[in-house]
Amino acid sequence: MKRYIITGCSRSGTSVTHNALKGHPNVSALNDEVLIEPYFNMGLSTFTHGRNLKIENEKGFQAIFDGICSIGANEDTEYIGLKTSLYYYPIYAKYVTSALEKYFPNIKVIITYRKDTVAQYGSWIRARKTGQYHSWNKKDKKLLHPIKLNKYQYIKQLLDNLDFMEELRNLNLTHDVLEFSYEDDICKGNFYKLFDFLKIPYYELDWLNSKKVAPSPKKYIKNYN
């Protein structure tokens, strides 16, 4: 079975992209998001005291990946994969790229990104305030009054995200990479690009029941402009 990974900055569409692939009949993917730390910087040492043999370290990353991502695999499975998103710590992007470059030379990489960085930051703040991070978590219907973003915190996250994306885009030099846009692909339903990238058959995404929960950014971000 072949491997893929979905990664990108937080609130850039990693989850809906993950769900679009996870439901495909030829894909087996771990349901939840994988923590960057400890897996991507420690590998097998996540479970040991670190006294691993060289061959264990070399094969440990792949063994863990294959083990957790193939739980739902069957005779139709062609790809196994996972998703992880970047937030808070700029070193996290380096953990991901280093692991992929060293241990996963043939993995397919899907990078999500968002052009509207104000909306991206506002989405993160709104999710934290409401506790509702995804549109398929319908148990929490709390509404949020319009919010005002802290421009200094926004600038910090913007700079962090630029660093994240610069590091991730280095993978274009070593891997087969698809950049998947929130505005141009996700919002327009262009999920066929994911299937084309992995060379798997196209299916109508009847398993994708996500609906937009938040109003448009201009409606709930007071200082959007």
Name each region found by the language model.
Residues D76-Y79, K108:
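Loop/turn-to-beta-strand initiation segments
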Residues R3-I5, E78-G81, V177-L178:
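Residue-level preference for the first positions of well-ordered beta-strands
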Residues M1, R51-K54, I80-T84, Y152-Q153:
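N-terminal start-of-chain detector that recognizes signal peptides
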Residues K22-H24, N74-D76, F104, N172-T174:
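Short, well-ordered coil/turn elements that cap or connect secondary structure elements
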Residues T84-Y202:
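PAPS-dependent sulfotransferase catalytic domain
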Residues M1-N74, E204-Y220:
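PAPS-dependent sulfotransferase catalytic core
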Residues I221-N225:
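Charge-rich, low-complexity intrinsically disordered segments
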